[in-house]
C-alpha cells in the first residue's frame, strides 16, 4: 500500500490523502475539508468501514415557532450520521441552542424546527453521512 498526501498550494489548510492498493488508487479524501457551502467532501473518517461525507448547506433565515425544510441535494445518501453543527451570522451554534427544538436530516431535506426566531441572520448546517454507493 502506498499513501499519497497533498496540500493546497494557495496556503489553505486543506489536506488530502489517497492510497494505492495493488496498483489501484482510491479517491482523494479530505483530512480537513474547507467546508464551502454546497460542496460535498469525502473525508478520511469511516463509519462501519464506509467513508463519511460532509456538506455545508445554507438554510437561510429561521422564523420563530416554525419548521423549515431545505433540500440538501445529496444523491445516494445512506446513513445520516448527524447534523454536526449549524451556525448563524451572529456565531450562534444551532445544535443544542434552546431556540432550536429540532434539526432532522432525511433522504432529501434538512428540517429545522424553531422556538425562537433567527430571522435577521442567515444560517447553515453541516451534515455528515454515508452513501449507498460505497
Give the ranges of each region predicted by the language model.
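Short, surface-exposed charged micro-motifs
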Residues: 15-17, 43, 102
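Trimeric beta-solenoid/beta-helix "fiber body" segments of extracellular/virion adhesins
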Residues: 1-33, 88-90
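Extracellular attachment/recognition segments
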Residues: 50-124, 130-134
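Glycine-rich, low-complexity segments
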Residues: 21-54, 76-78, 134
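Generic recognition of flexible, low-complexity loop/linker segments
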Residues: 3-5, 40-42, 100, 113-114
Amino acid at each position: 500500500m502506498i499513501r499519497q498526501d497533498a496540500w493546497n498550494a494557495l496556503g489553505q489548510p486543506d489536506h488530502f490523502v489517497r492510497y494505492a492498493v495493488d496498483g489501484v488508487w482510491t479517491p482523494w479524501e479530505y483530512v480537513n475539508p474547507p467546508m464551502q457551502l454546497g460542496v460535498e467532501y469525502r473525508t478520511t473518517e469511516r463509519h462501519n468501514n464506509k467513508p463519511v461525507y460532509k456538506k455545508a448547506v445554507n438554510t437561510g433565515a429561521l422564523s420563530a415557532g416554525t419548521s423549515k425544510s431545505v433540500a440538501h441535494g445529496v444523491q445516494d445518501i445512506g446513513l445520516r450520521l448527524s447534523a454536526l453543527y449549524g451556525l448563524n451570522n451572529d456565531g450562534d451554534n444551532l445544535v443544542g441552542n434552546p431556540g432550536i427544538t429540532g434539526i432532522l436530516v432525511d433522504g432529501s431535506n434538512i428540517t429545522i424546527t424553531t422556538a425562537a426566531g433567527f430571522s435577521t441572520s442567515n444560517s447553515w448546517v453541516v451534515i455528515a453521512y454515508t452513501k449507498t454507493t460505497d
